Amino acid sequence: KEVPSKDLGMMAMAYGHVYVASVAFGDNDSQTVRAFLEAESYEGPSFNIAYSHCIAHGYNLADGLDHQKMAVECGAWPLYRFDPRRTAMGENPLKLDSRAPKISFEEYALSETRFRMLMKTNPERSKRLLEEAQRVVQAKYDMYQQLANLHYGSDADQETN
């Protein structure tokens, strides 16, 4: 695609009172379980966004968990939990659970037929889109990291005075 996809998690977080998590049990099963337990215990609306492999991605579904891991490792699928209850405790509601990208988006993308098809039919466009996707993925991770590092509570109050 020529434009980045919508960030449904960020849209839900903007409401401020919705529990939101992004999970991929193929990368971090304990984070997935923790997110589901937190969402279950939350009194308000909760929204868990789970990476799901699909036959249309063009790989053996027996390798689905490995592809989930690659999606997280390249930054295309950041893992996080946004729990509004943390603000009442003076804590940042956003916890970024994934690490900084350690493989390229291209490495992840070219492991799936849905992306390789464009490389075969239109290599120039594919190269351009892969480069742009890498920039978008890195910018998205950087934004989540900045938001997760914001200070809340009494420390934040003192910094603004």
Would you name each region that the model predicts?
Residues 65-161:
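Conserved acidic/glycine
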Residues 1-100:
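Glycine-rich ThDP/TPP pyrophosphate-binding loop and its adjacent helix/strand module
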